[in-house]
C-alpha cells in the first residue's frame, strides 16, 4: 500500500480503538437502567464471583443482573442485523483484523457454547464496570432491546490468530 493508504489505515485503527471499553480488572455487568442505582460495587461484589461462565445471571434485590464472567476483556457493542453483539477480545494481532471480521456475520456457522434466557421489566439496559457503585462507574454503555424477554447466545470465535467471545442478544 502507498504511504498515504498506510497512514489512513493507522488513523482508522486509532479511531476504532476508541470503540472498545475496558474495566479496571473487574467484570462488566448488565442491568436494567431503572435498577442500576441499586448496584453498590464492592458491597455487591461477592455475588458476581459465583459466575464462572462467560455470561451468568444472578439476582440483586429480585432484579436480573448479567455478569460477564471469565477474565476481563476489552469489549465493544455492535448492532448488527437486529441483534446486539457484545464482542469481547481475548486476543488478536490488531484492531483492524477484528474490524474486518465484524463486517461479516461473524457468528454464522458457529454453535453457541452458552445460552441464557432473560426476562426484563423494561427494554432499557446499561452495561458498566462492576467494581464501583453505578453512580461512580466511569464507563456506562446504554442498550435498548426490541422486547423484554430475550435469549443471549455466547459464541467462541477462534480462527488463526484471533479469539473473541461474542454474546448475541436476540
Language-model-detected regions and their locations in the chain:
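N-terminal amphipathic/basic-hydrophobic helices that include classical n-h-c signal peptides
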Residues: 1-15
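Primarily secretory-pathway and cell-envelope proteins
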Residues: 11-110, 160-170
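Extended, solvent-exposed segments with strong compositional bias
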Residues: 102-138
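Beta-strand-connecting loop/turn residues
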Residues: 123, 159-160
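Phosphate-end processing signature that detects enzymes handling 5′-triphosphorylated RNA
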Residues: 141
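Surface-exposed coil/turn segments at beta-strand junctions on protein surfaces, enriched
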Residues: 145-147
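A short tyrosine-centered beta-strand micro-motif
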Residues: 150-152
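Short beta-strand-plus-loop segments that form exposed binding edges in beta-rich domains
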Residues: 156
Amino acid at each position: 500500500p502507498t504511504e498515504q493508504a498506510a497512514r489512513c489505515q493507522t488513523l482508522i485503527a486509532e479511531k476504532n480503538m476508541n470503540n472498545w471499553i475496558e474495566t479496571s480488572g473487574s467484570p462488566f455487568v448488565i442491568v436494567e437502567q431503572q435498577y442500576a442505582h441499586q448496584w453498590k460495587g464492592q458491597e455487591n461484589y461477592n455475588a458476581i464471583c459465583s459466575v464462572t461462565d462467560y455470561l451468568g445471571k444472578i439476582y440483586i434485590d429480585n432484579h436480573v443482573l448479567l455478569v460477564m464472567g471469565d477474565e476481563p476483556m476489552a469489549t465493544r457493542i455492535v448492532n448488527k442485523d437486529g441483534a446486539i453483539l457484545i464482542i469481547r477480545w481475548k486476543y488478536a494481532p490488531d484492531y483492524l483484523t477484528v474490524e474486518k471480521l465484524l463486517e461479516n456475520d461473524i457468528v454464522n456457522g458457529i454453535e453457541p457454547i452458552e445460552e441464557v434466557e432473560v426476562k426484563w421489566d423494561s427494554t432499557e439496559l446499561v452495561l458498566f464496570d462492576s467494581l464501583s457503585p453505578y453512580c461512580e462507574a466511569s464507563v456506562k454503555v446504554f442498550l435498548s432491546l426490541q422486547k423484554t424477554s430475550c435469549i443471549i447466545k455466547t459464541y467462541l470465535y477462534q480462527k488463526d490468530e484471533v479469539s473473541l467471545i461474542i454474546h448475541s442478544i436476540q
